[in-house]
């Protein structure tokens, strides 16, 4: 049936709640174009429609819901796990034929603490996101044969910083992707010198490419 009202790119697609890092969790209004900018091919170009992405984080948060949007944009598939469980993780990954997943840094530590096995590379996974990137990146890549990426993102923005595979610089978030401007500024919005601490400000070259409020 016809829609009662046409859907426009700037219409609100979802309200996703933040982690509450700096205070109470806040609902973020995301337009259709914000979601596409965050999840579309220009951000994570190495994820394709042939992938099956594991969801092992809450879907009320961008860490879980964002993966759904990423695969919707590509026509790919997802595998849904009840929650992260160190003992059940690899059996589920193998059974579901997962090819990509997202790990918080501490999850990586838990997986590496498991006893090494001859089956460590017996899976179909080709890439993983590690956020934040920890010093275990190289160990994880070598042990499990999985390319590791990292990003800097927030519910309100659209993945402005993305790494190359298997970064070696400890603490890196990656580099500015195409389609965004990123600056580090002081309290007067003046750009700080190289090596100095500043506030990161971001804008996209696409209208409605970030949150609506």
Predicted regions and their residues:
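Conserved ATP/PPi-binding loop(s) of AMP-dependent carboxylate-activating enzymes
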Residues: 190-213
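Conserved pre-ATP/AMP-binding loop-to-beta segment of ANL
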Residues: 2-17, 24, 46-52
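Gly/Ser/Thr-rich phosphate-binding loop
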Residues: 73, 90, 95-103, 112-170, ...
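Short Gly/Pro-enriched turn/cap motifs at secondary-structure boundaries
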Residues: 5-7, 171-176, 191
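Conserved AMP-binding/adenylation subdomain of ANL enzymes
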Residues: 36-52, 59-99, 110, 114
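Short coil-to-helix segment of the ABC ATPase nucleotide-binding domain corresponding to the Q-loop/switch region
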Residues: 31-32
């Amino acid at each position: 049936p016809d829609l009662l009202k046409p859907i426009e790119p700037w219409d609100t697609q979802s309200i996703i709640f933040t982690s509450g890092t700096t205070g109470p969790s806040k609902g973020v209004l995301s337009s259709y174009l914000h979601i596409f900018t965050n999840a579309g091919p220009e951000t994570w170009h190495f994820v394709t429609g042939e992938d099956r992405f594991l969801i092992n984080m809450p879907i009320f948060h961008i860490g879980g819901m964002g993966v759904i949007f990423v695969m919707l944009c590509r026509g790919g598939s997802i595998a849904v796990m009840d929650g992260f469980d160190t003992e059940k993780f690899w059996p589920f990954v193998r059974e579901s034929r997962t090819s990509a997943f997202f790990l918080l840094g501490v999850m990586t530590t838990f997986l590496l603490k498991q006893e090494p096995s001859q089956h460590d590379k017996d899976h179909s996974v080709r890439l993983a996101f590690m956020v934040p990137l920890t010093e275990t990146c190289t160990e994880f890549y070598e042990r499990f044969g999985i390319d590791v990426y990292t990003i800097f993102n927030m519910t309100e923005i659209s993945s402005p910083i993305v790494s190359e595979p298997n970064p070696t610089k400890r603490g890196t978030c990656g580099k500015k992707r195409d389609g965004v401007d990123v600056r580090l500024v002081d309290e007067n919005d003046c750009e700080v010198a190289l090596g100095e601490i500043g506030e990161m400000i971001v804008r996209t070259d696409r209208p409605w490419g970030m949150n609506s409020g």
